[in-house]
């Protein structure tokens, strides 16, 4: 059930052309191995540590390549989601945030790094309490919007729309903006119908707006997706959430 590998993820950075062909090949292999392991985290979460080890090897070859840092941020973020308590999660989200910032320091226009910065900030704000972390919420929105603006069709821009929608859906009034959340989730579902995260969050927005029948249809569609974009997220988080929401609507 592994998700289809996206070849562009393995491209070698432009400056790496000065490296030997052997080193270029090795860097590419590290990325492929790490991606495969991430794609199997739903079967064994220890694969995250194994993927992290490959990215550390990639850093040893190309220590100033921005892409590796946001990929390490992704691993820390996933580990935070699986952590046993809030303290452990918070530490890992901070680690992810710092690595994403390192990526942006090397490449200020990294769509992926800006997405991870915004997403980590959103999670840290959630752990702290929205009203106690207004600065984080504001920064998260700014970084997510910039990620989208830089490359609206990038797969991370699709994800950024969903995280932005969550920031507009979950907080209490007056921070809530269900109209904006509706637009963002509708666009995300349109851009990637197989992204279960956008589907389940779209259903949440519909429920908040009182459109329970449409929410049911979206949840059923989510659960019937045969080839989810990220099968690990679908199995660990999105499908269980969809089932829970659907049970509330029956």
PLM region spans:
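Short coil/linker segments at helix-helix boundaries
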Residues: 19-21, 29-53, 72-109, 115-146, ...
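Bacterial N-terminal signal peptides
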Residues: 2-10
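Extreme N-terminal leader/anchor segments
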Residues: 10-67, 216, 244, 250
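Long, ordered, amphipathic alpha-helical scaffolds
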Residues: 202-250
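Alpha-solenoid helical repeat architecture
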Residues: 193-199
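Short, local alpha-helical segments
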Residues: 185-187, 199-204
């Amino acid at each position: 059930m592994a998700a289809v590998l996206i070849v562009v993820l393995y491209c070698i950075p432009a400056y790496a052309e000065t490296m030997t062909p052997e080193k270029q090949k090795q860097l590419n292999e590290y990325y492929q191995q790490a991606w495969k392991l991430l794609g199997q985290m739903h079967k064994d979460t220890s694969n995250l540590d194994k993927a992290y080890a490959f990215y550390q090897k990639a850093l040893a070859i190309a220590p100033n390549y921005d892409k590796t840092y946001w990929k390490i941020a992704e691993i820390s973020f996933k580990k935070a989601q699986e952590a046993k308590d809030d303290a452990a999660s918070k530490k890992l989200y901070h680690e992810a945030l710092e690595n994403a910032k390192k990526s942006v320091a090397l490449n200020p226009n990294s769509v992926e790094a800006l997405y991870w910065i915004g997403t980590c900030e959103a999670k840290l704000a959630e752990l702290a309490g929205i009203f106690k972390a207004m600065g984080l919420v504001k920064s998260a929105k700014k970084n997510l919007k910039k990620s989208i603006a830089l490359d609206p069709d990038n797969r991370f821009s699709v994800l950024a729309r969903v995280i932005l929608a969550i920031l507009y859906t979950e907080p209490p009034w007056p921070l809530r903006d269900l109209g904006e959340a509706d637009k963002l989730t509708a666009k995300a579902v349109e851009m990637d119908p197989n992204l279960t995260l956008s589907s389940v969050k779209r259903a949440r927005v519909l429920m908040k707006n009182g459109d329970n029948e449409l929410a049911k249809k979206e949840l059923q569609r989510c659960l019937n997706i045969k080839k989810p974009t990220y099968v690990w997220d679908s199995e660990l988080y999105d499908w269980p959430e969809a089932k829970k929401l659907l049970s509330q609507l029956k």
